[in-house]
């Protein structure tokens, strides 16, 4: 059963195994505190663990971009990809975003990320334009009304 939940201090091992491999336990626990903050740079923000029963398999995030719109992201850790976790997690995140009063969701996906593009289309996102990301990668900007 897939669920979304806040990261817990005991999740430090998961995030240092799959994502922040150079962090100490203390720094990972501090980072989890930042994950759970309600705002980031003064904007509404949620970063939630994707849990498959008790195992954390990745995370989803949303941050307010403009009034009524949040940008979302998902990361499923490599050993758990291609098992439907991202679809289930984003579906739940869309419900949370709507309950928080947002009516539009945006996402940015690298043009060469075929699985993520297919996922966004399956979830009803539409490409609105193309851009170059802050990291210099060609991306699609997608939106979905909720």
Where are these regions (language model features)?
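Acetyl-CoA-dependent GNAT
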Residues: 6-10, 20-73, 77-79, 145-146
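Conserved GNAT acetyl-CoA-binding A-motif
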Residues: 97-109
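Conserved acetyl-CoA-binding loop-helix of GNAT-fold acetyltransferases
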Residues: 76, 82-95, 118-122
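Alpha-helical elements of Rossmann-like donor-binding domains used by nucleotide-donor carbohydrate transfer enzymes
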Residues: 14-17, 34, 88, 92, ...
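Conserved catalytic-core motifs of GNAT/GCN5-like acyltransferases
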Residues: 108-109, 124-141
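Amphipathic alpha-helical recognition patches that constitute DNA-binding helices
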Residues: 14, 71, 75, 89, ...
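A short beta-turn/loop motif at secondary-structure boundaries
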Residues: 64-66, 112, 133-135
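A short beta-loop-alpha structural element at the N-terminal edge
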Residues: 1-15
């Amino acid at each position: 059963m897939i669920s979304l939940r806040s990261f817990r201090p005991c999740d430090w091992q998961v995030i240092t195994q799959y994502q922040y491999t150079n962090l100490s336990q203390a720094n990972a626990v501090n980072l989890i505190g930042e994950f759970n903050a309600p705002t980031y740079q003064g904007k509404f923000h949620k970063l939630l663990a994707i849990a498959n029963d008790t195992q954390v398999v990745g995370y989803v995030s949303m941050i307010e971009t403009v009034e009524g719109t949040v940008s979302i992201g998902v990361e499923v850790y490599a050993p758990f990809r291609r098992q439907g976790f991202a679809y289930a997690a984003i579906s739940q995140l869309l419900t949370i975003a709507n309950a928080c009063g947002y009516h539009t969701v945006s996402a940015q996906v690298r043009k060469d990320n075929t699985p993520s593009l297919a996922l966004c289309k399956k979830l009803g996102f539409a490409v609105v334009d193309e851009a170059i990301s802050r990291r210099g990668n060609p991306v699609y900007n997608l939106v979905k009304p909720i």
